[in-house]
């Protein structure tokens, strides 16, 4: 019979020593034997554990570098490029949720900054073009005034008829300069944050009808046809009546000024139960497709030739006035012929109700007969 006893275990560093006491009973023969077993296999196992641990640390470091440090370096590089004014850089990496969220927000921010920078550059170019065009518009009538005034001062014009005509030309050119200054002042006033809105709930259709009636005689004289499409219901909306009146007046005045005789004009008001749509259309000379987006900017003209008597501020003025009241403003061109300007305002619990247009019956009949 063999009996084994574990006496003690000693750990020194990575070496374990186990002492066994063996008691053998074989017949009459008794002997005791101590066996000291040095666990070399435990040392080898511990060394293997250390190698595996070191390899795991290395692999984890590489994984961490790829999943965390790598994206952070890309974010840092993108921020540096954005700081230098390069907004075309976009982040694109695979990472954990938090870094992916940072990537999405960063790309959105860069896209917004890129758009803002493009608009800023476009505005700077527009200002430079506006200054050049403004100097041209001032220079032409002022030069004419100086020439006629100098001729009168030097006594070159002897005929009373010519003197009268020269004075009339000076007066007409001064009116153009005054109109230009007035338009510039109006644009500056509309850009001012201190401009009082003076909004009230008014009849959108009624104001449009009054404008159409005011221009009806001029339309007849120029053989223009006017189609007025206003619903028989009264729609109450938020508006500044003076700004709306002047904006529509600018649009109709531009239509008369820049289109040939026989042009058909339509002024329509549509209630979609969600928004009010005001549209001014004509089938006149139209505008080029490339000017569709910039036609509301100052000094942008459809004919690109600054030979007319207008100031070039016709469309920006009504757009700025209507921006105080409308949700959106746009223009459309149909094959370069039909041109329309659309303005819409969202309704705010203002349900339309009936309005008898007694004054408009005769006007509707006259407009439809043309």
Swiss-Prot record:
A Pfam family hit: HAMP
Segments forming domain Histidine kinase: 133-355
Has keyword Kinase?
Answer: yes
Report the locations given in the UniProt record. Answer: Cell membrane
- Choose one Gene Ontology CC annotation of this protein and give it: plasma membrane
Membrane topology is: Multi-pass membrane protein
Alphabetical keyword list: ATP-binding, Cell membrane, Kinase, Membrane, Nucleotide-binding, Phosphoprotein, Transferase, Transmembrane, Transmembrane helix, Two-component regulatory system
**What GO terms in the biological process aspect are recorded for it?**
cellular response to phosphate starvation
Q: List the EC numbers from the record.
A: 2.7.13.3
GO molecular-function annotation terms?
A: ATP binding; phosphoprotein phosphatase activity; phosphorelay sensor kinase activity
Q: Transmembrane residues, as ranges?
A: 2-22, 40-60
Q: What is the name attached to this protein's record? A: Sensor protein GtcS
> What reaction is this protein's catalytic activity?
ATP + protein L-histidine = ADP + protein N-phospho-L-histidine
Grouped into one coarse class, the protein's main location is membrane
Q: What does this protein do?
A: Member of the two-component regulatory system GtcS/GtcR which may act in the control of the transcription of the grs operon which encodes the multienzymes involved in the biosynthesis of the peptide antibiotic gramicidin S. Probably activates GtcR by phosphorylation.
Which InterPro entries has this protein been placed in? 2-comp_sensor_kinase, HAMP_dom, HATPase_C_sf, His_kinase_dom, HisK_dim/P_dom, HisK_dim/P_sf, Sig_transdc_His_kin-like_C
Recorded hits in PROSITE patterns, A to Z, give: HAMP, HIS_KIN
What are the residue boundaries of the HAMP domain, all occurrences included? 66-118
